């Protein structure tokens, strides 16, 4: 009688001790294993059900490493199999005098994901991790279902990138996560490389591959090595090869990775959409986790295609024959314009504009997501500084620069006679640009050009 009475009780207890199918499938674990790209131990972590769609997350510079993903990991692990790790040189992984480059990191991630994920995955990268993720998607496109880039660092040419941080005081950026390490990117690219290049032309790609250089000059510091390798990596031909749906998320107050990089990537990637987090810094995904998650979730579900490229003409605006800015500061100009004349103006922003011809004199101007198309010379500059992002300039001569400095990113120059002429010496820094002229047949251009009188591009 006692046996029959106790049987239901034991059955209930036994049922409670047997894990549910969902629980049994969870693989929340942390471990170390040997890797053969850098020759050390790598810290790995998984969360969630491996039968679910997979998400791989790549962190940026700094010993915080993969701990930056804590909130996102917990939000995703119910519906996704999440795989994270500390990149070698950071966090709990081995630190040594190795070449911590985007290409080598991509090789490592491919090996790890092949072993522990085993199927195409959604790839998310922040800061340097965004640059690594871009390199990875280019190198191993079959592995990636969607790409998410968060405040990606180091994509622009190093001269444009270092110039962005140079004017900022330490006090203005120290309150941002990981900034001390992120600043080393610019310290190295600016101070070290400029100093060396002034002495003699050097091949920095060759030097950074040498163990004695990394040991003596970079003191075997992983952050210094990774930072220098990042700004040396040439991303100029990569964006056009990325066909995965790409979500680009940026804090609009980021003082570490210039927001213009986001506009450039949105312009150049075939299927990309840029979302800004208002008042967000370099780690807006930590500062605004709910808003970040609201953007990320639909992207991972692929419930929409990334935003299409804008129409060739801006939506706004009635056509204005002539617009002038004279001796003003902080002026914003947009819309469809015949002739735009800017003289003695500072901090002018031209955005989402279509212009027939533009003349800038004694001014500082930023131009974004705009086109200048002319039957003659499209853009003339005299004694001015011009920053162009995600643009198109076309004419008999695209740009005529006189004693001016131009920083041109993600922009195509088309000139039936010349892309650039300079009656007076002018300096142009190109990042992920294109030139189509009698001298250059629609080529990618990435680097600095000094154009002297009589010379042209």
What does each model-found stretch correspond to?
Residues 208-235:
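Hydrophobic, aromatic-rich cap/lid helix
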Residues 2-56, 77-81, 119, 154, ...:
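Alpha/beta-hydrolase fold catalytic core
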Residues 242, 248-250, 254:
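Short beta-strand/loop motif that positions the catalytic acidic residue
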Residues 84-124:
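Active-site loop/oxyanion-hole signature of alpha/beta-hydrolase fold enzymes
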Residues 280-293:
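Catalytic histidine-centered segment of alpha/beta-hydrolase-like enzymes
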Residues 138, 147-187:
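Flexible "cap/lid" loop of the alpha/beta hydrolase fold
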Residues 322-324, 338-343, 356-362, 375-382, ...:
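Glycine-rich beta-solenoid repeat tracts in large extracellular/virion proteins
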Residues 47-92:
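Conserved HGGG/HGGXW glycine-rich cap/lid loop of the alpha/beta-hydrolase fold
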């Amino acid at each position: 009688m006692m046996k029959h009475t106790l049987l239901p009780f034991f059955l209930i207890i036994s049922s409670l001790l047997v894990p549910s199918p969902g629980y049994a499938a969870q693989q929340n674990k942390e471990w170390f294993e040997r890797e053969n790209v850098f020759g050390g131990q790598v810290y790995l972590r998984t969360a969630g059900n491996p039968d679910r769609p997979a998400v791989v997350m790549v962190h940026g510079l700094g010993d915080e490493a993969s701990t930056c993903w804590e909130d996102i990991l917990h939000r995703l692990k119910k519906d996704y199999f999440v795989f994270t790790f500390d990149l070698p040189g950071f966090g709990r992984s081995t630190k040594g005098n190795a070449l911590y480059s985007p290409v080598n990191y991509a090789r490592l991630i491919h090996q790890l994901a092949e072993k522990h994920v085993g199927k195409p995955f959604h790839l998310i990268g922040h800061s340097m991790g965004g640059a690594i993720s871009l390199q990875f998607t280019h190198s191993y496109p079959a592995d990636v279902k969607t790409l998410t880039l968060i405040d990606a660092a180091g994509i622009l040419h190093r001269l444009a990138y270092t110039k962005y941080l140079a004017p900022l005081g330490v006090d203005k950026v120290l309150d941002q996560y990981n900034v001390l390490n992120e600043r080393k990117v610019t310290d190295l690219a600016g101070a070290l490389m400029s100093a060396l290049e002034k002495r003699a032309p050097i091949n920095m790609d060759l030097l950074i591959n040498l163990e004695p250089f990394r040991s003596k000059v970079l003191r075997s510091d992983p952050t210094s090595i990774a930072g220098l390798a990042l700004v040396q990596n040439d991303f100029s031909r990569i964006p056009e090869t990325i066909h995965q749906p790409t979500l680009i998320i940026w804090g609009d107050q980021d003082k570490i990775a210039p927001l213009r990089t986001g506009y450039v990537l949105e312009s150049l990637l075939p299927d990309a959409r840029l979302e800004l987090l208002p008042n967000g810094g370099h780690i807006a995904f930590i500062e605004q986790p709910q808003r970040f998650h609201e953007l990320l979730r639909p992207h991972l579900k692929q419930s929409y295609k990334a935003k299409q490229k804008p129409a060739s003409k801006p939506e706004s605006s009635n056509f204005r024959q002539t617009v002038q800015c004279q001796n003003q500061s902080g002026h914003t100009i947009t819309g469809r314009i015949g002739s735009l004349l800017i003289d003695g103006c500072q901090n002018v922003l031209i955005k989402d504009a279509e212009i027939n011809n533009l003349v800038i004199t004694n001014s500082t101007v930023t131009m974004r997501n705009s086109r200048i198309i002319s039957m003659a010379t499209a853009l003339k500059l005299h004694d001015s500084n011009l920053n162009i992002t995600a643009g198109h300039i076309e004419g008999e001569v695209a740009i005529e620069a006189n004693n001016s400095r131009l920083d041109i990113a993600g922009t195509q120059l088309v000139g039936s006679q010349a892309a650039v002429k300079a009656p007076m010496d002018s300096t142009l820094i190109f990042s992920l640009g294109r030139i189509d002229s009698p001298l250059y047949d629609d080529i990618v251009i990435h680097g600095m050009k000094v154009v002297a009188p009589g010379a042209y591009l």
